[in-house]
């Protein structure tokens, strides 16, 4: 009898018992569905812990397999070490299972409940405070009224920041933060594998292709979004994206001189048949399809924003506050992988500018947008939100300096900002502002500048800008790839987030609303509201699609309608 036979049987017995326990726990999860008062957050936490236990079970199985001793002479030294490691893993696993059993018996964690009650109490106290202060305002006049109103807003800000801070800590308690980090990472890696598979066919001569020309008549942010739109259609129709970028107005050498190629194996647009876009079904037998700009796209496929893949939707809703933005960001992430020289430029600029956290990014667009697509906004409008967020950050971290990364196409703004706000440290490169002017915009130096601005804006802890600007929206999209959920890390002075050429942006009414003025629209729960914009005053504007009426409605009375599309899942990417 070999000396390890007993150990092997013992290991297998424990693994079998552990597997049985996992099955038992799973059964309890199913039975617990009869109790709807369990929050979705707690369910997410339990599922994440179960996933970790399953992974450890698989790790132990592999370790046990490695302990099989071949016939013949046995070297006992390494085997003894492996058994000890296995024993330690089993002890840890047993502790985790016991902790899990305690949590399922005892309900939510202590920290979770303490924070939940604190938020509940904070909301009640805020209501008491509002009632009391507004009653006082009725009896005040002149300077006394102004003074009391200012103090009222100051105290109101403290209340709001207290609740927001507690909500942040609630989102991190009981392992929820760790789960969100892992889930976001797993989803990103999954999508990037699928894109990489699509973009690198084994035989380019036989691959179906979608051709996209980068030279749309607009600036860098707009052109990048044009390529993203092409990429999403290519992904949905299972075609390799061929990006034509020679004689690019920003860099005559093309996209690949700045960013990594979109494919390592297939950059040739040739094929046995070529045609212009006429719809996914009609183009089925055409090998090479040329895509127009989104403004001229007809028929429109379902793959346009703000739709997300059906197979990922449930996971995305759990992990991210704006799944549509996250989905767009995955294509941006793949496209802007820098060439080594650009990577070096970014590193050197980071050191030269002294870019460090905490820092808030501010983007001020002053040239071609103002007067046409956007209104003029003075620096004071931006800095109100900068100061508010620094006060919020100060409740969670040490704010040694209030740093602001200022990106603008107005070279005079940096001096103005430093003069008006001496207590802030403004980080900015005025040479980028000069290169962003209309006369210098389409040069390689200008391209370098806008790429650096977008990089630093995306790296900030919070973003204040106008979403009417493509640069601001690109920075916000990239920000989503750097955090599990950065959907709330912005304030736009004008538009809500949108993607040029997107399909309708709809919301669903969750509370009834009866208009109090002629500007408002009625709503009933379940009504579909086509949102036009948020006025950032508690009201949004949109159309009640059931009634055909357009007007204002309270923003809190609706939720986002998540649009899903049956995208291909590319199972070959997992092989």
Swiss-Prot record:
Q: Which GO terms describe its cellular component?
A: extracellular exosome; Golgi apparatus; Golgi cisterna membrane; Golgi membrane; membrane
Q: Which domain of life is it from?
A: Eukaryota
Q: For this UniProt entry, what is the primary localization, expressed as one broad class? A: Golgi
InterPro entries the UniProt entry points to = Fut8, Fut8_N_cat, Fut8_SH3, GT23_dom, SH3-like_dom_sf, SH3_domain
Residue(s) carrying Phosphoserine: 278
UniProt keyword Phosphoprotein, yes or no:
yes
Q: Where in the cell is it found?
A: Golgi apparatus, Golgi stack membrane
Q: Which family does it belong to?
A: Belongs to the glycosyltransferase 23 family.
Q: What is this protein called?
A: Alpha-(1,6)-fucosyltransferase
State the organism of origin. Answer: Homo sapiens
């Amino acid at each position: 009898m070999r000396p390890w036979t007993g150990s092997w049987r013992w290991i297998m017995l424990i693994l079998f018992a552990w597997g049985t326990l996992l099955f038992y726990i799973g059964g309890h999860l199913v039975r617990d569905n009869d109790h709807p008062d369990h929050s979705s957050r707690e369910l997410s936490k339990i599922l994440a812990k179960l996933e970790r236990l399953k992974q450890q079970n698989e790790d132990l199985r592999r370790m046990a397999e490695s302990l099989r001793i071949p016939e013949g002479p046995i070297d006992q030294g390494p085997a003894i070490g492996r058994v000890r490691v296995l024993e330690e893993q089993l002890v840890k696993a047993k502790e985790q299972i016991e902790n899990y059993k305690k949590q399922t018996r005892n309900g939510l964690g202590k920290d979770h409940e303490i924070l939940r009650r604190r938020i509940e109490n904070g909301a009640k106290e805020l209501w008491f405070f509002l009632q009391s202060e507004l009653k006082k305002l009725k009896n005040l006049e002149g300077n006394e009224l102004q003074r009391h109103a200012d103090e009222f807003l100051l105290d109101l800000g403290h209340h709001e920041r207290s609740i927001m801070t507690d909500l942040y800590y609630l989102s991190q308690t009981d392992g929820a933060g760790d789960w969100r980090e892992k889930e976001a990472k797993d989803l990103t890696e999954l999508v990037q594998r699928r894109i990489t598979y699509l973009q690198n066919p084994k035989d380019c001569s036989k691959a179906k292709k979608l051709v996209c020309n980068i030279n749309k008549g607009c600036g860098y942010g707009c052109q990048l979004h044009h390529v993203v739109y092409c990429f999403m259609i290519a992904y949905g129709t299972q075609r390799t994206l061929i990006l034509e970028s020679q004689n690019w107005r920003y860099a005559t050498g093309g996209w690949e001189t700045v960013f990594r190629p979109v494919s390592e194996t297939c950059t040739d647009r040739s094929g046995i048949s070529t045609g212009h876009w006429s719809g996914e079904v009609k183009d089925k037998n055409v090998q090479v399809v040329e895509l127009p700009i989104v403004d001229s796209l007809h028929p429109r496929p379902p793959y346009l924003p703000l739709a997300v893949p059906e197979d990922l939707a449930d996971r995305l809703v759990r992990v991210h506050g704006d799944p549509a933005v996250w989905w767009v960001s995955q294509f941006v992430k793949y496209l802007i992988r820098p060439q080594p020289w650009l990577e070096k430029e970014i590193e050197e600029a980071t050191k030269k500018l002294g870019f460090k956290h905490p820092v808030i990014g501010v983007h001020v667009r002053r040239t071609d947008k103002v007067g046409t697509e956007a209104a003029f906004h003075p620096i004071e409008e931006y800095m109100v939100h900068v100061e508010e967020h620094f006060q919020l950050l100060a409740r969670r971290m040490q704010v040694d300096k209030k740093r602001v990364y200022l990106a603008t196409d107005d070279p005079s703004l940096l001096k103005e900002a430093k003069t008006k706000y001496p207590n802030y440290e403004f980080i900015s490169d005025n040479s980028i502002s000069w290169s962003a002017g209309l006369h210098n915009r389409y040069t390689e130096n200008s391209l370098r500048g806008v790429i650096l601005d977008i990089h630093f804006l995306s790296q900030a802890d919070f973003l204040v800008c106008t979403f009417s600007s493509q640069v601001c929206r690109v920075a916000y999209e990239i920000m989503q790839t750097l955090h599990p959920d950065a959907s709330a890390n912005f304030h736009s002075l004008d538009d809500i987030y949108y993607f040029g050429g997107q399909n309708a942006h709809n919301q669903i009414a969750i509370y009834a609303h009866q208009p109090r003025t002629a500007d408002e629209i009625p709503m009933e729960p379940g009504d579909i509201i086509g949102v036009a914009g948020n006025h950032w005053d508690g009201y949004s504007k949109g159309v009640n699609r059931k009634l055909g009426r357009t007007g204002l409605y309270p923003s809190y009375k609706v939720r986002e309608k998540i649009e899903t599309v049956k995208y291909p899942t590319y199972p070959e990417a997992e092989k």
